[in-house]
UniProtKB/Swiss-Prot annotation:
Compositional bias of kind Acidic residues: 1318-1330
Residue ranges of every copy of the GRIP domain listed in the record: 1703-1753
Name the UniProt record assigns to this protein: RanBP2-like and GRIP domain-containing protein 4
GO biological process per UniProt: NLS-bearing protein import into nucleus
Extent of the TPR repeats: 60-93, 584-617
Length: 1758
C-alpha cells in the first residue's frame, strides 16, 4: 500500500509527539524511512534511516535499506559501501553479494573489487546465468588477451546449459570476431539438432548472418565448391526457419524485409544448381516454403491493415499456396545423413499440410475459386501483382527469384483428404507436439466431412501410451491414456471453433478465412489448457526438472477429473454430447475389435454422464457454470428441451452398439427394436443378415434353409423401412451411418439371395456342394455393392467373431472332420489288409499339365487363411518345392517323403469343401503284394464334408516300395534290397554304387510303431499308359544333398499323466518383499496323476502363451486355507518348480463361483488321500502273479548291481588299477570303452561310456526308475539280457548312453522313467539298426575346431558360485563385476596358482590374476562372507591394479575359499601341488538335502543280492546319474528306491543302537574301483572275469573281463562287519558271477526264505518309514526356505542402511574437501598453504609427483 508525503508527515508527527525521549524517536526512524520510501521521498527516507543507524548501527537491514536508496539515486559507490557493510553484519545475505558484484561491474569493470565480488558470488551461486554474464563482462574488458579465457568460460557454460540461446550466440560471435568463420559454421551445424535453439529468433538470425559472412569469404576460393554448396544448403534452411519465426513474432515490415532477403538467397542458389545433389533437393523444398510464407505474409497484411481488400489478398495468397502445394516432395536419398533426411521430410510434410489446408480454407463456399485464381494470376501480370504486393523495394523484378520464376504451369488441383491426413501425421513431428499446431489442424478438419485423425497424431507423439485405461474412476497421472488426450484435443478444438465463429459473426468478410495460417493466427487455446498439455508431455516424456515433478503431477491430476467427467466436472452438456458422438463415430470407423470396444465404451461413459444433465434441462433447471472452467461455456450451443428426446435416442443406440460389439447380440437386438429410427433399422438389418450368413456357411438342412430365409426376410423388411423413412423425410438420411446407395445395394443383394432360395436352391444339389467356378464363394458382400467400409460399421467381439474368422473356423472344422473320416477309412483299410491279399487303395485322378490354364492361380487364401491341408496320416512334415508342379515335370515324381502317400496333389475349392485328386502309384504302406496283381478302381470315397477323390487312371500294374509291419524299424537298407524291375527303386545296379549304408539308421523307427496303430495309406505312383514307356526299366537314382533329420516329437511333460481335475482360475503369488498378493496368471489349473508312480501334481499354464505359472507336487503336508474375505479363493504353500528351480511359494487360486472352489478342495483332499493309499511300486505289481517271486528276486539282484556301481561312482578316493584276469567261457561280442579325462570346466573327471544309457533321477523318490513288463513264457523262447556294459547279443533294450541333464521340475522327472519290455517289436538285430546307404557329401563340413579356454593344463582346486565386485575410485563405491563360478587353478608345470572367474552364460572374464605371496584376504566391514583383496588383474587384457571383493552365499564356502587361498600362496613358495578340498566336491545349491539325510536314506534303502543261475532272467532296468564334481572324484547320484528288505534297516533308523552303517567301500579307500571285488564264482565254470585298465587319464572297461581288487582299507572298515558279498549279473546263454563280500557275523537277510506276503509286509512297513522320513525332510526344507527368505530380507535391509551410511559419509567428505580446497586457493602462498597440504594429500590420495607439484603451488612457484 503506497502513501503520500502528507500522510507520512502526519504520522511521523503523531508518533514523535508521543515518544518520551529522543532515542525512542530515533528508533522509529526505520519505519518512518519506509513510509517516505513508499511516497518516493528518498531524501526524507535517507534522513530518517541515518538517524536510525546512529542509534542502531549494527542492524544490517538498515544498511541494506540505505544502500537501496543510494542505488535509486545512482550513487553506486555509496550503495556498494552500504551493501558491503550489511553483508559484514549478516553474511547469510547471498543475494546481496550478487547485487554488489553487479553494481561494481556496471560501474567500472576494471575495478579490482569487481573481480573479487564476482568470484565470491560464484561460490554462492554455482552455475547461475547471472554469474556467467558478470564473468563475461570481466573478460570482455581484457580484449584479445581474455579471449582464450572467455572461450573456456563459454565452453564450460555450454556443458552445463546447452540450450541457452545467449551462450550459443556469444560463442559464435566470438568465433566471428576472431575471424574463425569455419568454427562458427561448425558450431551452427552442431546446434541444429537442438530444438530450443531452432525455435529461437535470435539464434536463427545469428546463424543466417554467420552463413552469409562465410559464403562471402568463400567466393574468392574457387577450389572449394563443395563447401560452398553445403553452406548454401544450410543458409536456405536457416532462412526458412527464420521466416517462420519472424511471421509469428514480428511486424509486417520486418517480415517483408526478411522475405526479400530470402528471395535473394534463393536467386543466388538458383544460378548454381546442377544435377541431382543435396543443394538441388533442398532448393526445391525451400521454393515451396518461400511461396507458403509469401501467402502467410499476405494474410498477415490483411490481419493488421486498415481498409483491407480481402478478396485481392486472398486470391494472391491462394496463388502462393497453390504453387507451394504443387512443389513435389524432395528426393530424400539425395540428402546425406539420417538427421538431414528426417528434417527435410518433416518440412515437406509441414508445407504440404499447411498449404493444402489453407487452399481448402480459402476456397470454402466459393465455386471454382481456384480455377479463377489460376486463370487470373498464373501469368506475368499476376506475377507482377504478387511482387508489388510483397516487396516495397524498387529493385528490378528480373533479378529477384519471385520475379523470374515460372508460374505458368500451375494446375487447378484441390488437395485430397487422404493425402492431407497423411501429411498431417508427418507435420506433427515437425512441430514436436505443439498444442497450437494440433488445435489449428483440428480446426481445419472441423469444417471438413471427414473426422480428424487425432488418434494417429497422438500415436506419433506418445508411442508407448495405452489407448484406454481400466481405471476411469481414478485421477492418478499414471492412468492417463490416448483417449484422455484425444478427448482433451476434441474439447480444445470444439471451444476454439465456437470462439472463432463468435468473432466472425461480428465483423467478417466473405473472403476472409475463418482461420488464418498457423504462423499468423493468434493463440487458439487458453493458458490453462496450454499449461496442462505441457505438463502432460513433460511427465510422459520424463523431462521434468528435479523438484518440479510434484507440481506437474498435481496440475495433471486436477484436470483428469474434468476430462473423465468425474465428480464436479463443470463441463457444458453440449461438450459432453459432442465427445460422445465423436468417439462413437471414430470407434465405428476402426477395424480392430478392441479399438472399437474402447472408443464406444468411452462414448457410453460420456452418455451416462450427460443423461442426468438432460433430465435437469428437461425440468428447465439451470446447470451451474464454474468460474474458471477448463473449457469455456458457450451459450450459443446450449441444449434445448426440444432436442433432449433425440439425444436420449442417440444414447440408447450407442448402448446397443456396445452390446453388439461385446457379443451380447440378443440384448442389442432388443434395444434396437425398441428404438424407432433409421439407425436402429440399419443395425438390425446388419445383425439379421449376419445371422443368415452364419447359417449359410454350412450345408443346410430344410429347417436351416427356412431359418435363413426368415433372417433374410427380416433384413429386407428393415432395409425397406429405411428407404420409406428417407423418402418421407429427407432429414433422416443425415442420421444414417452409411450412404443411402449402400442401403439400396444391400437390399438388391438380399432380394437376389431370396430369389435363389425360391428357385430350388441351385447352390445345393444332391446333398453336395456346387463347384462355383473353382473358387471359394465368399459369404461377405462384394465391396462394389454394399460393402460396409470400416467407417460405417462395427466389428464383433470374440463371442461373435468377425465374418472372416468364422469362415476360417468353419473351414478348419471341415478339415478336421475330413481328416477324422480319412483316418477311420484308412483304419478300415488296414484291418482289411490283414484278411485279404488285395490291398485297398485310394482311387486316383490324373490331371495332365494342361488341366489348368496358363496364368491361372488357384485360390490360395480364404479370408487370409492358407488353404494348405495335410491329407496323409503320418506326422512327418516335409515341404515341397514350388517348381515341382505338374506343369513343370514330364512325369509326376515322389517329391515328398515316403511317409507321405501323395505325389501330385491338386485342390479344387468350392464354397464349403474340396475335391482332392490323389495320385501315388507304386509307393505303398502295409503288407506286401504280388508284383503283377491287378487292381480294380474303386468308387470315389464320399463323405459328408465335401472331400471327393475320383479314380480315372484305370488299372495299374507294378510293385511299389512297401512300408511293412514285419519290422518296427524302417531303414534305407530295406529299400535297397528291393530288386523289382517295374516299381519304384532307389539307386542303380552299379558295383561302384555303395547304396545307403550308414545313412538313415533308425530313420523311421519312431514312426513305424505309430504307423501300425494308425491308418496305412496305399497309393500307386502314377504312370502314363504309353507316352513315357522305355525298353528298359527306369533306374532312378536320387543323390540327396542334405539328409533330412529325424522328426522331433513335441514333448510338453504331461504325456504319462492323467488329468484328474481341470478348471479355469486366476492364480496369485504372495510377494514377500512388498507384502502383497500379485497376479501370477489366468488359465486352467490341472491336477495330474503320474501313471507310473501314482503321485499327483498341480500344473497351471497361462492362456495363449502357455507359460508355466504353477508346477509342484501335492504332498500330504500341504493344507488349503481360505483367503480372508473371499469364499471363492484357496491359499496354500508349496515348493514350486515353475521357474525351473524349486522355490517356496505361497499361492492362491480364485474361482468363478464358491461351488467351483469347493469342488477343487474336494479333489485336492482326494489326491492327498490317494498319496496315503498308493500301493508299493515294486516289480511284482507289474507282472503276472505266477512269476512274482522269481521276478522280485531277480529285480533285486539287478538293483544290487546298480547299487554297487553307485558305490563305485560315489567313492571319493577311488583309483583305477590296471588288472586283467584271463578266464574261459563265452561272452557277448563287442566291448564298451570308458575314458576318464580331466575336464577344465568341472572340478572332476568325466566318465564316458560308449553305447551306455546313464540317466538321472535327481534324488526324487517319486519317480520309478524301472518298470518290468513280462510276456508269457511261450512267446519268449529266447531270453535277452537287460543289463549289460557295451554291446551284447541281439535284442538288448537296456544300454548305457550319455547322461542327460538333471531334471529339476516334476514335469521333467516324469519323463525320466524307462520302460523295458520283451515284445516281438524289439527283436531287431544290431545289423538291421546299422545298415543303410552312404551319401557322399556335396559340400564337406570344415574340420572341427577345438575351443581352447586357456585352462587345459591347470588343476581346479576350488570352484564355487559367487558374486564379484570391483571398487570404482571415480565414484567411490563398489560396483558389481559379475556373477559366476570363481575358480582357483594351479598349473601342472610351473605350479603357479591363479584366480579365474567368468560370468554366467556369456563366459566373459571378470577376474584373471595370479595369487602372489604378498596378497592378503581381508573381511569386508559388516560381513564375514565377503573377502577383499588387491591384485594386478588381466581380465580386460591389460594389466590393471584392481581392488576386488567376492561374496559367497554360505559362510563355510567363504572359509574354504580363504583356506585354499592361503594354501595357494604356500604351495607356490614350496613349488608343490595343492590338495583339492573335499568340501568343493559339490556346491550347496546342487545338494538336494543334507549329508545326514543322505546317509539315513542310503541305509534305509540298502538292497540285497543273491547268487542265481543264468537261465531265468527277469526284465529290469534302472537309471543312474553320473556327475563329475572333482579332479579325483567321480560321483553318481542314484534315485533312492522306495523299498527295503529286512528289519535291520528299520531298526537301524528308529532304535538307539549305535551300529555302523553298511557300506561297500570307504571314502578314504584307494586302489579299488567299486570298493569291492568281482571274483569268479566257484560254482560256475563258464564265467569270465572283467578287468578295468587305467592309463593316464583314460581307463577302458571291458564288461566280460573285469577283475577289481578290494582295498585293504575296506577289509578293516566297518567293524569288520563287511566281509563278503556275492552277486551275479545274468547274461544270455551264459552267466557271469560276481562275488561280493558279505558280513560274517550274521547270515545275510536276503538268504532267508520269505513268502510273498512276508515280503509285501516288510516292504510296506519300510516304505512307511521312508515316507515318514521324507515328510520330515520336506518340512525341514520348507522351514529352512522360510528362514532363508527372512534372512535375505534382513540382509538386504542391512545393506541398504550401510549404503545410506556410506553415501552420507561420502557427501560429508566431499563437502569437507571442497572447503579445504577453497581455503587453499584463497590463502597466500607460504606456511598457511603448507599447513593444508597433508589434508589434501590424504583425501585425494595423490601420487608423489602430484604431491611435489602441489607443494610447489603452495610455495607460490607455479
Amino acid at each position: 500500500m503506497s502513501c503520500s508525503k502528507a500522510y507520512g508527515e502526519r504520522y511521523v508527527a503523531s508518533v514523535q509527539g508521543s515518544a518520551p525521549s529522543p532515542r525512542k524517536k530515533s528508533t522509529r526512524g526505520f519505519y518512518f524511512a519506509k513510509l517516505y520510501y513508499e511516497a518516493k521521498e528518498y531524501d526524507l527516507a535517507k534522513k530518517y534511516i541515518c538517524t536510525y543507524i546512529n542509534v542502531r548501527e549494527m542492524d544490517p537491514r538498515a544498511h541494506r535499506f540505505l544502500g537501496l536508496l543510494y542505488e535509486l539515486e545512482e550513487n553506486t559507490e555509496k550503495a556498494v559501501e552500504c551493501y558491503r557493510r550489511s553483508v559484514e553484519l549478516n553474511p547469510t545475505q547471498k543475494d546481496l553479494v550478487l547485487k554488489i558484484a553487479e553494481l561494481l561491474c556496471k560501474n567500472d569493470v576494471t575495478d579490482g573489487r569487481a573481480k573479487y565480488w564476482v568470484e565470491r558470488a560464484a561460490k554462492l551461486f554455482p552455475g547461475s546465468p547471472a554469474i556467467y554474464k558478470l564473468k563475461e563482462q570481466l573478460l570482455d574488458c581484457e580484449g584479445e588477451d581474455g579471449w582464450n579465457k572467455l572461450f573456456d568460460l563459454i565452453q564450460s557454460e555450454l556443458y552445463v546449459r546447452p540450450d541457452d540461446v545467449h551462450v550459443n550466440i556469444r560463442l559464435v560471435e566470438l568465433y566471428r570476431s576472431t575471424k574463425r568463420l569455419k568454427d562458427a559454421v561448425a558450431r551452427c551445424h552442431e546446434a541444429e539438432r537442438n530444438i530450443a535453439l531452432r525455435s529461437s529468433l535470435e539464434w536463427n538470425s545469428c546463424v543466417v548472418q554467420t552463413l552469409k559472412e562465410y559464403l562471402e569469404s568463400l567466393q574468392c576460393l574457387e577450389s572449394d565448391k563443395s563447401d560452398w554448396r553445403a553452406t548454401n544448403t544450410d543458409l536456405l534452411l536457416a532462412y526458412a526457419n527464420l521466416m517462420l519465426l519472424t511471421l509469428s513474432t514480428r511486424d509486417v515490415q520486418e517480415s517483408r524485409e526478411l522475405l526479400e532477403s530470402f528471395d535473394s538467397a534463393l536467386q543466388s542458389a538458383k544460378s548454381s544448381l546442377g544435377g541431382n545433389d543435396e543443394l538441388s533437393a533442398t532448393f526445391l523444398e525451400m521454393k515451396g516454403h518461400f511461396y507458403m510464407h509469401a501467402g502467410s505474409l499476405l494474410l498477415k497484411m490483411g490481419q493488421h491493415g486498415n481498409n483491407v481488400q480481402w478478396r485481392a489478398l486472398s486470391e494472391l495468397a491462394a496463388l502462393c499456396y497453390l504453387i507451394a502445394f504443387q512443389v513435389p516432395r524432395p528426393k530424400i536419398k539425395l540428402i546425406k545423413g539420417e538427421a538431414g533426411q528426417n528434417l527435410l521430410e518433416m518440412m515437406a510434410c509441414d508445407r504440404l499440410s499447411q498449404s493444402g489446408h489453407m487452399l481448402l480454407n480459402l476456397s470454402r463456399g466459393k465455386q471454382d475459386f481456384l480455377k479463377v485464381v489460376v486463370e487470373t494470376f498464373a501469368n506475368k501480370s499476376g506475377q507482377s501483382a504478387l511482387y508489388d504486393a510483397l516487396f516495397s523495394s524498387q529493385s528490378p523484378k528480373d533479378t529477384s527469384f519471385l520475379g523470374s520464376d515460372d508460374i505458368g504451369n500451375i494446375d487447378v488441383q484441390e488437395p485430397e483428404l487422404e493425402d492431407l491426413a497423411r501429411y498431417d501425421v508427418g507435420a506433427i513431428r515437425a512441430h514436436n507436439g505443439s498444442l497450437q499446431h494440433l488445435t489449428w489442424l483440428g480446426l481445419q478438419w472441423n469444417s471438413l466431412p471427414a473426422l480428424p485423425g487425432i488418434r494417429k497424431w497422438l500415436k506419433q507423439l506418445f508411442h508407448h501410451l495405452p489407448q484406454e485405461t481400466s481405471r476411469l474412476e481414478t485421477n492418478a497421472p499414471e492412468s492417463i491414456c490416448i483417449l484422455d488426450l484425444e478427448v482433451f484435443l476434441l474439447g480444445v478444438v470444439y471451444t476454439s471453433h465456437l470462439q472463432l465463429k463468435e468473432k466472425c459473426n461480428s465483423h467478417h468478410s466473405s473472403y476472409q478465412p475463418l482461420c488464418l495460417p498457423l504462423p499468423v493466427c493468434k493463440q487458439l487455446c487458453t493458458e490453462r489448457q496450454k499449461s496442462w498439455w505441457d505438463a502432460v508431455c513433460t511427465l510422459i516424456h520424463r523431462k521434468a526438472v528435479p523438484g518440479n515433478s510434484a507440481k506437474l503431477r498435481l496440475l495433471v491430476q486436477h484436470e483428469i477429473n474434468t476430462l473423465r467427467a468425474q465428480e464436479k466436472h463443470g463441463l457444458q452438456p453440449a461438450l459432453l454430447v459432442h465427445w460422445a458422438k465423436c468417439l462413437q463415430k471414430m470407434g465405428s470407423g476402426l477395424n480392430s475389435f478392441y479399438d472399437q470396444r474402447e472408443y464406444i465404451g468411452r462414448s457410453v461413459h460420456y452418455w451416462k454422464k450427460v443423461l442426468p444433465l438432460l433430465k435437469i434441462i428437461k425440468k428447465k433447471n439451470s446447470i451451474p457454470e464454474p468460474i474458471d472452467p477448463l473449457f469455456k461455456h458457450f451459450h450459443s450451443v446450449d441444449i434445448q428441451a426440444s432436442e433432449i428426446v433425440e439425444y436420449e435416442e442417440d444414447a440408447h443406440v450407442t448402448f446397443a452398439i456396445l452390446d453388439a460389439v461385446n457379443g451380447n447380440i440378443e440384448d442389442a437386438m432388443t434395444a434396437f427394436e425398441s428404438i424407432k429410427s433409421v439407425v436402429s433399422y440399419w443395425n438390425l438389418a446388419l445383425i439379421f443378415h449376419r445371422k443368415a450368413e452364419d447359417i449359410a456357411n454350412d450345408a443346410l438342412s430344410p429347417e436351416e434353409q427356412e431359418e435363413c430365409k426368415n433372417y433374410l426376410r427380416k433384413t429386407r423388411g428393415y432395409l425397406i423401412k429405411i428407404l420409406d423413412d428417407s423418402d418421407s423425410n429427407l432429414s433422416v438420411v443425415k442420421k444414417l451411418p452409411v450412404p443411402l446407395e449402400s442401403v439400396k445395394e444391400m437390399l438388391k443383394s438380399v432380394m437376389q439371395e431370396l430369389e435363389n432360395y425360391s428357385e430350388g436352391d441351385p447352390l445345393y444339389k444332391n446333398g453336395s456342394l456346387r463347384n462355383a467356378d473353382s473358387e471359394i464363394k465368399h459369404s461377405t458382400p462384394s465391396p462394389t455393392k454394399y460393402s460396409l467400409s470400416p467407417s460405417k460399421s462395427y466389428k464383433y467381439s470374440p463371442k461373435t467373431p468377425p465374418r472372416w474368422a468364422e469362415d476360417q473356423n468353419s473351414l478348419l472344422k471341415m478339415i478336421r472332420q475330413e481328416v477324422k473320416a480319412i483316418k477311420e477309412e484308412m483304419q478300415e483299410l488296414k484291418l482289411n489288409s490283414s484278411k485279404s491279399a488285395s490291398h485297398h487303395r485310394w482311387p486316383t485322378e490324373n490331371y495332365g499339365p494342361d488341366s489348368v490354364p496358363d496364368g491361372y492361380q488357384g485360390s490360395q487364401t480364404f479370408h487370409g487363411a492358407p488353404l494348405t491341408v495335410a491329407t496323409t496320416g503320418p506326422s512327418v512334415y516335409y515341404s515341397q518345392s514350388p517348381a515341382y508342379n505338374s506343369q513343370y515335370l514330364l512325369r509326376p515324381a515322389a517329391n515328398v517323403t515316403p511317409t507321405k502317400g501323395s505325389s501330385n496333389t491338386e485342390f479344387k475349392s468350392t464354397k464349403e469343401g474340396f475335391s482332392i485328386p490323389v495320385s501315388a502309384d507304386g509307393f505303398k504302406f502295409g503288407i506286401s503284394e504280388p508284383g503283377n496283381q491287378e487292381k480294380e478302381s474303386e468308387k470315389p470315397l464320399e463323405n459328408d464334408t465335401g472331400f471327393q477323390a475320383q479314380d480315372i487312371s484305370g488299372q495299374k500294374n507294378g510293385r511299389g516300395v512297401i512300408f511293412g509291419q514285419t519290422s518296427s524299424t524302417f531303414t534305407f537298407a530295406d529299400v535297397a534290397k528291393s530288386t523289382s524291375g517295374e516299381g519304384f527303386q532307389f539307386g542303380k545296379k552299379d558295383p561302384n554304387f555303395k547304396g545307403f549304408s550308414g545313412a538313415g539308421e533308425k530313420l523311421f523307427s519312431s514312426q513305424c510303431g505309430k504307423m501300425a496303430n494308425k491308418a496305412n495309406t496305399s497309393g500307386d505312383f502314377e504312370k502314363d499308359d504309353d507316352a513315357y514307356k522305355t525298353e528298359d526299366s527306369d533306374d532312378i537314382h536320387f543323390e540327396p544333398v542334405v539328409q533330412m533329420p529325424e522328426k522331433v516329437e513335441l514333448v510338453i511333460g504331461e504325456e504319462g499323466e492323467k488329468v484328474l481335475y481341470s478348471q479355469g482360475v486366476k492364480l496369485f503369488r504372495f510377494d514377500a518383499e512388498v507384502r502383497q498378493w500379485k497376479e501370477r496368471g489366468l488359465g486352467n489349473l490341472k491336477i495330474l496323476k503320474n501313471e507310473v508312480n501314482g503321485k499327483p501334481r498341480m500344473l497351471m499354464r497361462r492362456e495363449q502363451v502357455l507359460k508355466v505359472c504353477a508346477n509342484h507336487w501335492i504332498t500330504t503336508t500341504m493344507n488349503l486355507k481360505p483367503l480372508s474375505g473371499s469364499d471363492r479363493a484357496w491359499m496354500w504353500s508349496a515348493s514350486d518348480f515353475s521357474d525351473g528351480d524349486a522355490k517356496l511359494e505361497r499361492l492362491a487360486a480364485k474361482f468363478k463361483t464358491p461351488e467351483l472352489a469347493e469342488e477343487f478342495k474336494q479333489k485336492f483332499e482326494e489326491c492327498q488321500q490317494l498319496l496315503l493309499d498308493i500301493p508299493l511300486q515294486t516289480p511284482h505289481k507289474l507282472v503276472d502273479t505266477g512269476r512274482a517271486a522269481k521276478l522280485i528276486q531277480r529285480a533285486e539282484e539287478m538293483k544290487s548291481g546298480l547299487k554297487d556301481f553307485k558305490t563305485f561312482l560315489t567313492n571319493d578316493q577311488t583309483k583305477v588299477t590296471e588288472e586283467e584276469n584271463k578266464g574261459s567261457g563265452t561272452g557277448a561280442a563287442g566291448a564298451s570303452d570308458t575314458t576318464i579325462k580331466p575336464n577344465p570346466e568341472n572340478t572332476g573327471p568325466t566318465l564316458e561310456w560308449d553305447n551306455c544309457d546313464l540317466r538321472e533321477d535327481a534324488l526324487d523318490d517319486s519317480v520309478s526308475s524301472s518298470s518290468v513288463h513280462a510276456s508269457p513264457l511261450a512267446s519268449s523262447p529266447v531270453r535277452k539280457n537287460l543289463f549289460h556294459f557295451g554291446e551284447s547279443t541281439t535284442g538288448s533294450n537296456f544300454s548305457f548312453k550319455s547322461a542327460l541333464s538333471p531334471s529339476k521340475s516334476p514335469a521333467k522327472l516324469n519323463q525320466s522313467g524307462t520302460s523295458v519290455g520283451t515284445d516281438e517289436e524289439s527283436d531287431v538285430t544290431q545289423e538291421e539298426e546299422r545298415d543303410g546307404q552312404y551319401f557322399e557329401p556335396v559340400v564337406p563340413l570344415p574340420d572341427l575346431v577345438e575351443v581352447s579356454s586357456g585352462e587345459e593344463n591347470e588343476k581346479v582346486v576350488f570352484s564355487h558360485r559367487a558374486e564379484l565386485y570391483r571398487y570404482d575410485k571415480d565414484v567411490g563405491q563398489w560396483k558389481e563385476r559379475g556373477i559366476g563360478d570363481i575358480k582357483i587353478l594351479q598349473n601342472y608345470d610351473n605350479k603357479q596358482v591363479r584366480i579365474v572367474m567368468r560370468r554366467d552364460q556369456v563366459l566373459k572374464l571378470c577376474a584373471n590374476h595370479t595369487i602372489t605371496p604378498d596378497m592378503s584376504l581381508q573381511n569386508m566391514k559388516g560381513t564375514e562372507r565377503v573377502w577383499v583383496w588387491t591384485a594386478c588383474d588381466f581380465a580386460d587384457g591389460e594389466r590393471k591394479v584392481e581392488h576386488l571383493a567376492v561374496r559367497f552365499k554360505l559362510q563355510d564356502v567363504a572359509d574354504s575359499f580363504k583356506k585354499i587361498f592361503d594354501e595357494a600362496k604356500t604351495a607356490q613358495e614350496k613349488d608343490s601341488l595343492i590338495t583339492p578340498h573335499v568340501s568343493r566336491s559339490s556346491t550347496p545349491r546342487e545338494s538336494p538335502c543334507g549329508k545326514i539325510a543322505v546317509a539315513v536314506l542310503e541305509e534305509t534303502t540298502r538292497e540285497r543280492t543273491d547268487v542265481i543261475q543264468g537261465d531265468d532272467v527277469a526284465d529290469a532296468a534302472s537309471e543312474v546319474e553320473v556327475s563329475s564334481t572333482s579332479e579325483t572324484t567321480t560321483k553318481a547320484v542314484v534315485s533312492p528306491p522306495k523299498f527295503v528288505f529286512g528289519s535291520e534297516s528299520v531298526k537301524r533308523i528308529f532304535s538307539s543302537e549305535k551300529s555302523k552303517p553298511f557300506a561297500f567301500g570307504n571314502s578314504s579307500a584307494t586302489g579299488s574301483l567299486f570298493g569291492f571285488s568281482f571274483n569268479a564264482s566257484l560254482k560256475s565254470n563258464n564265467s569270465e572275469t572283467s578287468s578295468v585298465a587305467q592309463s593316464g587319464s583314460e581307463s577302458k572297461v571291458e564288461p566280460k573281463k573285469c577283475e577289481l581288487s578290494k582295498n585293504s582299507d575296506i577289509e578293516q572298515s566297518s567293524d569288520s562287519k563287511v566281509k563278503n558279498l556275492s552277486a551275479s549279473f545274468p547274461m544270455e546263454e551264459s552267466s557271469i558271477n560276481y562275488t561280493f563280500k558279505t558280513p560274517e557275523k550274521e547270515p545275510p537277510l536276503w538268504h532267508a526264505e520269505f513268502t510273498k506276503e512276508e515280503l509285501v509286509q516288510k516292504l510296506s512297513s519300510t516304505t512307511k518309514s521312508a515316507d515318514h522320513l521324507n515328510g520330515l525332510l520336506r518340512e525341514a526344507e520348507a522351514t529352512s526356505a522360510v528362514l532363508m527368505e527372512q534372512i535375505k530380507l534382513l540382509k538386504s535391509e542391512i545393506r541398504r542402511l550401510e549404503r545410506n551410511q556410506e553415501q552420507e559419509e561420502s557427501a560429508a567428505n566431499v563437502e569437507h574437501l571442497k572447503n579445504v580446497l577453497l581455503q587453499f586457493i584463497f590463502l597466500k602462498p607460504g606456511s598457511e598453504r603448507e599447513r593444508l597440504l597433508p589434508v589434501i594429500n590424504t583425501m585425494l590420495q595423490l601420487s608423489p609427483e602430484e604431491k611435489g607439484k602441489l607443494a610447489a603451488v603452495a610455495q607460490g612457484e607455479e
